[in-house]
Swiss-Prot record:
Residues 513-873 are annotated as: Fibronectin-binding. This is Fibronectin-binding protein A. D- repeats lie at residues 746-783, 784-821, 822-860, 861-875. Residues 746-875 are annotated as: 4 X approximate tandem repeats. The modification Pentaglycyl murein peptidoglycan amidated threonine is found at residue 982.
Length: 1015
């Protein structure tokens, strides 16, 4: 019996061995068939977009996964641009190497969305990680928390590595959330700027006047005054501004280096500040005091000085000012002072600039011979007779020879010494002749005065001086016409240029008269609009009295000449700062005593004027539940202010006076001093509602440090007041006024929160649906309805398309895209890329499909879980003999009518998936590369890439928690193939065929042996 058994085994050995060997060949060749292609030709794809790197998230429960072993043999010029799932580790190297995946998926619970820009460096490995990887482009990492999958769901993990891209092809396309937040914070921190309200300004009246008469003498300190009466529209806010433009022959600063214009004030409260913009443009900007003011008017007066650079000679000048299209003009003669002269020489001078901050000034002196006469042994000196700084440094003196004609020298005493055609610097030639001293003086000695010279002086004056006077003096001897024993006597010419600084409130006698600069401001308070009722029993009136001291300033002025002859006409240069200090008003509201109010007035006598006060009034309790306190900067009411100022002081906000004298041979002095007066009348109209009440207590006056605070209280019931006359006298009156009035306000029923996204390039989605962004080759198209929540991640570039309706918007980049019909009952996580160069196809109704390639096979079925779609452009492993699978036959390109191919099944027969098993290829229908094969069914299908006979093209669908979508941009495509076209796969198929035949042969032998054995 043992022999029979041994014989039986030996007899069946050939057949069993054949079956075993054939099965091993089939299985082995099937497992290794994917590694055949990569060494001949790779896919050529021109792409402009970035590849997105995704961090896949597996199911929260551990599932058994069937992972095909992938041998990556492609050569990469850059790092792989996809980050695989947690269950797979992909190593890309130059040589082929297998990648083994574990059998269990790891859970993930990441909830944040991270978008990071990574370095453009190439690294040979891409490993599974939750942190950023160094890629050849911008990395986009999406971590979302998935929902728990059903127990019957099997996750198929198939790793795909995108086509490599070089770093130069990478372009940013994702706006990070941090950038959005920073942009929003920047917009929140944006400072609100005002608007130009020039068009809302009405010029009720405008004029340009010459206070000194029908002409202007700039060297005598004369100027013109621009007067405006303006009316503004309601609704002005802080920061709003209006502009007006002056002609170029005037300026607002004279010789002062301070470039500013007076403020518009309401009492001591600044309502608008002025600034010089250049080119004659003046701008006034309103402060926050303008808020809630209506019926705003302003009286503006600005001093205008003749510009010596523009107006260099005597003559008529047209002075203009334009505001809101309305031009105010005046034509007036300009007359300059010729200086002091005799028959031989002329001396003239002018202070060019004056800087109070640095205590410096500049002076220009003309020294020129007259009538062709020359002088010998001439000495010119410059000295500070008043305001000399003995401890100061040496002045800077430059001597220039005038090369032009004498009559062309500017009468305005202006010298553009940088013009070398007219001015030659001869300071170095005066070595030994020019000397300077520490006290600010200089002396220049000339052997002969036969040329015209211009002397430019820069020096200091003593800080704190109330007067500055610079004297230019010339000593000389006329040239003798005939040589004789008679000696001609010498002569002396003296010219003074002085500055007298005094308070704007001063007034003085002089031929120049008054210089007035007023800025009155009127308005009505709008803070209680629509909330108060009643009226005052008597109209409130403001009374302002100005008692100004007319005592002229005491100015020491000296001129001296030689008794031989000639005369001197000297003057003091005047400087005035253009700021106007408005008169502040202290008032007390005096209304009819029959209504129970205070009768009387408050009188304040002061030397300097900022006055504020406090006033407390209670409104009728019938109309208000409570009293609301607020500060009011207006000055309603009546009162009396006596202002006295007779002090000479150096102040930034000050004007200047003039002293002009003429000395004849009899040494008589004419004193023609000029002073300026600031007279600012503020008229306030403040109509407030009726008040009835009774005084509850006395008025308390507290005077400390020259600061007066006046409190008054009015009751809420009718009655008679016990107030009397209140008098307050202080040295430096600074009265704070506080008015407490009630008002009605609204109420917010709840908190309101507003959030705004300022991104302009975001797409607009009006309805939901599935927006699928797919990067790879074989990607199913999903249609149907979603019962779960959709999460969208979008790109905020400007090139995004606009989706008007929902449905399924699918962005597809590659060739073979199957189509899946059914319903999705769970959450789909969709990532979208909307590059500018993608075409858009609309397939009826709500399903917009955006794709770029040829074939779109169609797969029908229904998915009950969350779908994660991954595609591999290489055919999968054929199933084991128990569950044979037949790859789908490629079809010719007919993109107009999509077809519905059968759903492919996963390669593991133990855990079958819902899609139907594809049929194996039919060897009877050969297909040459590049030629389409007739379709297996009558209805046309989406175009697919032609393959060789025996090649398996099977879309692989992995059911996971996330739709994997990386959509690289393709701008231009020429003839390109998706997979390498090599013969490796054909040889693999032949090997599999050989193995199969070997197995069949073995089975046949076994069957034959069995029959023979029975026989």
């Amino acid at each position: 019996m043992k022999n029979n058994l041994r014989y039986g085994i030996r007899k069946h050995k050939l057949g069993a061995a054949s079956v075993f060997l054939g099965t091993m060949i089939v299985v082995g060749m099937g497992q290794d068939k994917e590694a055949a292609a990569s060494e001949q030709k790779t896919t050529t794809v021109e792409e402009n977009g970035n590849s997105a790197t995704e961090n896949k998230v597996n199911e929260t429960q551990t599932t058994t996964t069937n992972v095909n072993t992938i041998d990556e043999t492609q050569s990469y010029s850059a790092t792989a641009t996809e980050q695989p799932s947690n269950a797979t580790q992909v190593t890309t190297e130059e040589a082929p190497k297998a990648v083994q995946a574990p059998q269990t998926a790891q859970p993930a619970n990441l909830e944040t969305v991270k978008e990071e820009v990574v370095k453009e460096e190439a690294k040979p490995q891409v490993k599974e990680t939750t942190q950023s990887q160094d890629n050849s482009g911008d990395q986009r990492q999406v971590d979302l928390t998935p929902k728990k999958a059903t127990q019957n769901q099997v996750a198929e993990t198939q790793v795909e590595v995108a086509q490599p891209r070089t770093a130069s092809e990478s372009k940013p396309r994702v706006t990070r959330s941090a950038d959005v937040v920073e942009a929003k914070e920047a917009s929140d921190e944006k400072v609100e700027t005002g608007t130009d309200v020039t068009s809302k300004v009405t010029v009720e009246s405008g004029s340009i006047e010459a206070p000194q008469g029908n002409k202007v003498e700039p060297h005598a300190g004369q100027r013109v005054v621009l007067k405006y009466k303006l009316k503004f529209a309601d609704g002005l806010k802080r920061g709003d501004y209006f502009d007006f433009t002056l002609s170029n022959n005037v300026n607002t600063y004279g010789v002062s280096t301070a470039r500013k214009v007076p403020e518009i004030k309401n009492g001591s409260v600044v309502m608008a500040t002025g600034e010089i913009l250049g080119n004659g443009n003046i701008r006034y900007t309103f402060t926050n005091e303008i808020e809630h003011k209506v019926e705003v008017t302003a009286n503006l007066e600005i001093n205008l000085f003749i510009d010596p650079k523009t107006v260099q000679s005597n003559g008529e000048q047209k002075i203009t000012s334009k505001l809101n299209g309305e031009e105010t003009e005046k034509t007036i003669p300009v007359v300059y002072n010729p200086g002091v002269s005799n028959s031989y020489t002329n001396v003239n001078g002018s202070i060019e600039t004056f800087n109070k901050e640095s205590n410096k000034f500049t002076h220009i002196a003309y020294i020129k011979p007259m009538n062709g006469n020359q002088s010998n042994t001439v000495s010119v000196t410059g000295t500070l007779t008043e305001g000399s700084n003995l401890a100061g440094g040496q002045p800077t003196v430059k001597v220039y020879e005038y090369l032009g004609k004498k009559d062309e020298l500017p009468q305005s005493v202006y010298a553009n010494t940088s013009d070398t055609n007219k001015f030659k610097d001869v300071t170095k030639e005066m070595n030994g002749k020019l000397s300077v001293q520490d006290n600010g003086s200089y002396s220049l000695n000339l052997d002969k005065l036969d040329k015209t010279y211009v002397i430019h002086y820069t020096g200091e004056y003593l800080q704190g001086s109330d007067q500055v006077n610079f004297r230019t003096e010339l000593y000389g001897y006329p040239e003798r016409a005939y040589k004789s024993y008679y000696v001609y006597g010498g002569y002396r010419l003296t010219w003074d240029n002085g500055l007298v600084l005094y308070s704007n409130k001063a007034d003085g006698n002089g031929k120049n008269g008054q210089i007035i600069q007023n800025n009155d401001f009127e308005y009505k308070e709008d803070t209680a609009k629509g909330t108060m009722s009643g009226q005052y029993d008597a109209k409130q009136i403001i009374e302002t009295e100005e008692n100004q001291d007319n005592t002229p300033l005491d100015i020491d002025y000296h001129t001296a000449i030689d008794g031989e002859g000639g005369y001197v006409d000297g003057y003091i240069e005047t400087i005035e700062e253009t700021d106007s200090s408005a008169i502040d008003i202290d008032y007390h509201t005096a209304v009819d005593s029959e209504a129970g109010h205070v009768g009387g007035y408050t009188e304040s006598s002061e030397e300097s004027n900022p006055i504020d006060f406090e006033e407390s009034t209670h409104e009728n309790s019938k109309h208000h539940a409570d009293v609301v306190e607020y500060e009011e900067d207006t000055n309603p009411g009546g009162g009396q202010v006596t202002t006295e100022s007779n002090l000479v002081e150096f102040d930034e906000e000050s004007t200047k006076g003039i002293v002009t004298g003429a000395v004849s041979d009899h040494t008589t002095i004419e004193d023609t001093k000029e002073y300026t007066t600031e007279s600012n009348l503020i008229e306030l109209v403040d109509e407030l509602p009726e008040e009835h009440g009774q005084a509850q207590g006395p008025i308390e006056e507290i005077t400390e440090n020259n600061h007066h605070i006046s409190h008054s209280g009015l009751g809420t019931e009718n009655g008679h007041g016990n107030y009397g006359v209140i008098e307050e006298i202080e040295e430096n009156s600074h009265v704070d006024i506080k008015s407490e009035l009630g008002y009605e306000g609204g109420q917010n029923s709840g908190n309101q929160s507003f959030e705004e996204d300022t991104e302009e390039d975001k797409p607009k989605y009006e309805q939901g649906g599935n927006i699928v962004d797919i990067d790879f080759d074989s990607v199913p198209q999903i249609q149907g309805q979603n019962n779960g929540n959709q999460s969208f991640e979008e790109d905020t570039e400007k090139d995004k398309p606009k989706y008007e309706q929902g449905g399924n918007i699918i962005d597809i980049d590659f060739d073979s895209v199957p189509q899946i019909h059914g319903f999705n009952k769970h959450t789909e996580i969709i990532e979208e890329d909307t590059n500018k160069d993608k075409p858009n196809y609309q397939f009826g109704g709500h399903n917009s499909v955006d794709f770029e390639e040829d074939t779109l096979p169609k797969v029908s079925g229904q998915n009950e879980g969350q779908q994660t779609i991954e595609e591999d452009t290489t055919p999968p492993t054929p199933p084991t003999p128990e569950v044979p699978s037949e790859p789908e036959t490629p079809t010719p390109p007919t993109p107009e009518v999509p077809s519905e191919p059968e759903t492919p099944t996963p390669p593991t027969p133990e855990v079958p998936s819902e899609p139907e098993t594809p049929t194996p290829p039919t060897p009877e229908v050969p297909a040459e590369p590049g030629k389409p094969v007739p379709p297996a069914k009558e209805e046309p299908k989406k175009p697919s890439k032609p393959v060789e006979q025996g090649k398996v093209v099977t879309p692989v669908i992995e059911i996971n928690e996330k739709v994997k979508a990386v959509a690289p941009t393709k701008k231009a495509q020429s003839k390109k193939s998706e997979l390498p076209e090599t013969g490796g796969e054909e040889s693999t198929n032949k090997g599999m065929l050989f193995g199969g035949l070997f197995s069949i042969l073995g089975l046949a032998l076994l069957r034959r042996n069995k029959k023979n054995n029975k026989a």
